[in-house]
Design a protein with these regions (language model features):
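N-terminal Lys/Arg-rich, disordered targeting/topogenic segments
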Residues: 1-15
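Hydrophobic beta-strand anchors of alpha/beta hydrolase catalytic cores
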Residues: 91-92, 118, 164
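A short beta-strand-turn-helix
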Residues: 51-90
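Short pre-active-site segment immediately N-terminal to redox-active cysteine/selenocysteine motifs
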Residues: 88-90, 94-98, 160
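Structural microenvironment flanking redox-active thiols in thiol-disulfide oxidoreductases
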Residues: 103-138, 148-154
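Thiol/disulfide oxidoreductase modules built on the thioredoxin-like
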Residues: 136-140, 148-192
């Protein structure tokens, strides 16, 4: 009798695990499908260049590499900003001052920006002066371009924030995410975008 009970318990446990596995698989498929749909308009292939107006902060002025005081918006381009980080994968992070999820991501972006080049794009968050004020209040030290009308964001296919675009050292968009992204997932994408071109360069050319 005890053997029969043990057998039934084992069968029930196996069935339970199969059910859990099926549920997790369906959940993962749903997450991937939703993420794919949300990022369907984000750029692929070569990263589109864009004119940028950097918020007047010390970090932005330094990133632009142009003369100007910390109180003056600094014009530059995405290509010029990327050129300051040769051989490195970079991240472009679209956010908004009014976005609560973006605020949750700020500590991750702050940590990420200490190890990787990160460019923020403040979508529909006011002019350069207002964005700079928000940055100072929140301690956002990474360079940020202002996009008061959302024109730049729309040209990149960004319809909701936060969104993260990872560009490899050769200027190719490798990853694009929409919605909250954990820091480890951001770092993994940047590492992958940095490493894969290096590996490909070592392969024998046919």
């Amino acid at each position: 009798m005890l053997k029969a009970l043990a057998t039934r318990a084992a069968q029930s446990l196996r069935k339970s695990w199969r059910q859990h596995l099926a549920t997790l698989t369906l959940a993962w498929v749903a997450i991937v499908a939703v993420d794919t749909w949300r990022t369907r308009d984000l750029p692929q292939g070569p990263a589109p260049d864009a004119a940028l107006v950097m918020a007047p902060s010390a970090g932005a002025a330094g990133a632009a590499g142009a003369a100007g005081s910390a109180a003056t918006p600094v014009p530059t381009t995405l290509a010029a900003w990327r050129a300051q980080h040769p051989g490195q994968a970079v991240a472009v992070h679209f956010w908004a001052e009014w976005c609560s999820i973006c605020k949750l991501e700020e500590p991750s972006i702050a940590s990420l920006s200490t190890d990787w080049p990160v460019l923020g794009v403040a979508m529909q968050s006011g002019n350069a002066e207002k964005v700079a004020q928000v940055q100072r209040q929140r301690g956002m030290a990474w360079p940020t371009a202002v996009d008061p009308q959302g024109t730049l964001s729309r040209s990149w296919g960004v319809r909701a924030v936060p969104a993260l675009v990872v560009i490899d050292p050769h200027g190719q968009v490798r990853f694009a995410t929409s919605g909250y992204t954990p820091e480890w997932a951001m770092r993994l994408r940047l590492w992958w975008a940095q490493t894969i071109p290096q590996w490909k360069a070592l392969l024998p050319k046919q």
